[in-house]
């Protein structure tokens, strides 16, 4: 299937909303993808994507906007929630599991249960929440690396639509604060060795699809690398580079 508007093959055209997948609200425990082993099981490839970050930075809004094309009208703190869909990547089915976690301190002991078999982390902070950005390196990276030393991380700046919001800027100014500069966020991504840094908005859906496209590709690469025989490890980088280009172009539909 040819690339669609909003695909990485079309730089600067990431505003298009994704095609909504089927959604299954998880009813099992925080770490349960529906069975044993990695997400997807033996019948097909699977990617388990875990969203982490401070409370109220918009993690749930990202998931809801991506999976339903809707937007939550009120803030309800998340405990733990699972969403899943089957996506077509390079002509093969991939089960995408999204684990939305609670950022509040009272869930610090429970939250790591969601990290089991994680293929990719979306580490979220609000671009208009300096304290949430500070916690990226002070709290979240150490927590992730304690439980998943090698899993890739994508740093995500949420609520980008509020960067120029006058009311938000006034409130920040009262506290002698400013929005997080994009340059500072990119530098942070380099320091924590994140796969990439992407700013997005769940409300306008700008760069929203790009965030989850990147998560799927990075998650598949990581999952494959964990299963690669050691003897073929030296050939992995070139092979994955070729495949990732194909996936970026062809990942554009849900089934």
Curated annotation (Swiss-Prot):
* Origin species: Bos taurus (Bovine)
Quote the protein name from its UniProt record. Answer: Rho-related GTP-binding protein RhoU
Superkingdom assignment: Eukaryota
Membrane-related topology note: Lipid-anchor
Q: Where is the lipid attached (S-palmitoyl cysteine)?
A: 253
Q: Where is the signal peptide?
A: none
Keywords for the protein's UniProt record, in alphabetical order: Cell junction, Cell membrane, Cell projection, Golgi apparatus, GTP-binding, Isopeptide bond, Lipoprotein, Magnesium, Membrane, Metal-binding, Nucleotide-binding, Palmitate, Phosphoprotein, Ubl conjugation
Cellular localization per UniProt: Cell membrane; Golgi apparatus membrane; Cell junction, Focal adhesion; Cell projection, Podosome
Q: Which InterPro entries match?
A: P-loop_NTPase (IPR027417), Small_GTP-bd (IPR005225), Small_GTPase (IPR001806), Small_GTPase_Rho (IPR003578)
Comp. bias regions, Gly residues: 28-43
GO MF term set: GTP binding; GTPase activity; metal ion binding; protein kinase binding
